[in-house]
Structures are given as structure tokens and as C-alpha cells.
């Protein structure tokens, strides 16, 4: 009996879905443009965005060059956005803002274009190309609409995404450090600081430069150790000046002591050889 009821329910669901699709298809085939447009708006306001989008797309060509063209294009893009199809929505909003620069919807379209990329932006561990696009779009919106009532919201999005890029740069550099490729780590860490000097990871980046320099020097052949310990001391002094109260300061001081001891021994050996 239970199985019968489940099968019956499935049939009913399919039948209802089919009837709705049939209703939309029938309207597109037999309905007048104004009727289709009105029904699309009705579905839109009832939050039935897939059906609304189908109808908007069905009459889009009919209204080309009319006063309804921009509204149909905007509502269709918004349906995609509200259905979480952000990739399609971004394409449609981008097309809208280029074609309808004077539309009453253009500010909303610009904002949602930026927000599409924000919502598609992945976690910091993944490629951040989309995040960079989102930041560009968000800053374009902020620049064009400084009086918008959404300006604070978009500034918050910008800050969030910027922090994500900071984290990505840190993680990329840390990966080299973690696998023991200290020369590559030093380059990547310095590039991260150069690209994002205000990074929230600045202290950690600078400490890892010190540590990478120390490990590189410690594991180098004798002919390269002096120069590498000197480079380590330079980075350690910079770290100490900027972060004198850091949780890493004791470790940095320890590495500096070891480096100085090595340099002192090396100097004495060199002096003895001269004598």
C-alpha cells in the first residue's frame, strides 16, 4: 500500500509539472505578446522564476526596439539571478548594461552583475580569477554610484573579497615553505607582500621569510651560507622593527643568535686561514 501511494504521488507530481509546462508552452504558441508579458510578470512576482524566464525569453524578440525591451531583458536576467544561475545572469546583466545605459534598471543591473561574480567567487584555496573579476565589477559600481543606498553593502563585499585574495597569496607562498622549497617560498612571500602590503597576513608572511631564509642558509653548502645568513639577519631585523611584540619574536631572536654564531665562527676561521 505504501509503495502504491508513493507511486501515485510521483505520478501526480509529474502530471502537475507537465500541465504547468504545457500551460507555458501553450501560452507561447497561442497567446498574444501582451498576455505572455503579463503572465511572465505574474510568475516573476510569485517567485516562479524559471517559468517567468521562459516567457520573457519567448517574447523578447517581439519587443525589440520598444519601450518594453529593457524591462524584459532586465527581468529575465533577474530571474536567472534569483534562480542562482549566476553565470548566465552575469552574462545577461553585462549585455544589459552595455545596451541600455540610460535605462531606469541600469544601476540595479550593474549591482547584480557585480554580485553575480561575488556569489561565484570560490574559497581562497581555489583559483581566484572570478574573485578578481568580482572586485573589478564591485569597484566599478562604487565609482559610478557613490550615492547608492547599497554602497556600504558593496564596500563590505569588496573588503571580504580582498581578504580572500590576501589569504590566497599567503596560501600559495606557504605551500612552497611547507614542502621545503625555501628559495621559491621567499620569492612568493615577498611577492605577496609587494602585491598586498596591507595584508592581514603581513606578520605571518614576514616571519616565514625570516624562517625560510634561516632554513635555506642552514641547509646550504658552506660557500653560500654566509650570504644567506646575512640575508636572514636583514629580514629578521625588519620583522623585529615592525612586530616587536609578535608571538614569533623569541623564535626570530633564536634564529638571529644562531646566524650570528655561525658568522662569528666563519670570520674566525677566515682570519686563522689568513694568518
Predicted region positions:
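Sec-dependent N-terminal signal peptides
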Residues: 6-12
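Acidic, polar-rich low-complexity tracts and alpha-helical solenoid repeat scaffolds
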Residues: 2-6, 17-275
Amino acid at each position: 500500500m505504501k509503495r502504491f501511494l508513493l507511486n501515485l504521488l510521483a505520478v501526480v507530481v509529474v502530471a502537475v509539472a507537465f500541465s504547468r509546462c504545457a500551460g507555458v508552452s501553450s501560452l507561447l504558441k497561442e497567446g498574444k505578446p501582451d498576455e505572455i508579458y503579463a503572465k511572465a510578470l505574474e510568475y516573476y512576482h510569485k517567485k516562479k522564476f524559471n517559468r517567468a524566464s521562459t516567457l520573457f525569453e519567448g517574447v523578447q524578440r517581439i519587443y525589440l526596439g520598444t519601450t518594453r525591451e529593457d524591462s524584459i531583458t532586465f527581468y529575465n536576467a533577474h530571474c536567472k539571478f534569483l534562480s542562482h544561475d549566476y553565470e548566465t545572469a552575469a552574462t545577461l546583466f553585462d549585455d544589459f548594461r552595455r545596451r541600455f545605459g540610460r535605462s531606469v534598471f541600469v544601476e540595479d543591473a550593474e549591482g547584480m552583475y557585480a554580485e553575480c561574480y561575488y556569489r561565484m567567487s570560490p574559497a581562497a584555496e581555489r583559483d581566484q580569477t572570478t574573485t578578481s573579476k568580482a572586485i573589478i565589477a564591485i569597484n566599478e559600481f562604487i565609482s559610478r554610484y557613490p550615492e547608492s543606498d547599497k554602497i556600504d553593502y558593496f564596500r563590505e563585499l569588496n573588503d571580504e573579497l580582498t581578504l580572500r585574495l590576501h589569504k590566497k597569496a599567503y596560501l600559495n607562498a606557504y605551500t612552497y615553505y611547507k614542502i621545503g622549497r625555501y628559495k621559491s617560498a621567499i620569492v612568493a612571500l615577498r611577492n605577496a607582500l609587494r602585491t598586498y602590503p596591507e595584508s592581514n597576513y603581513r606578520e605571518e608572511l614576514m616571519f616565514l621569510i625570516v624562517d625560510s631564509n634561516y632554513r635555506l642558509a642552514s641547509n646550504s653548502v658552506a660557500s653560500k651560507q654566509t650570504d644567506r645568513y646575512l640575508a636572514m639577519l636583514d629580514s629578521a631585523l625588519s620583522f623585529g622593527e615592525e612586530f616587536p611584540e609578535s608571538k614569533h619574536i623569541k623564535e626570530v631572536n633564536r634564529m638571529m643568535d644562531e646566524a650570528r654564531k655561525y658568522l662569528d665562527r666563519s670570520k674566525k676561521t677566515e682570519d686563522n686561514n689568513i694568518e
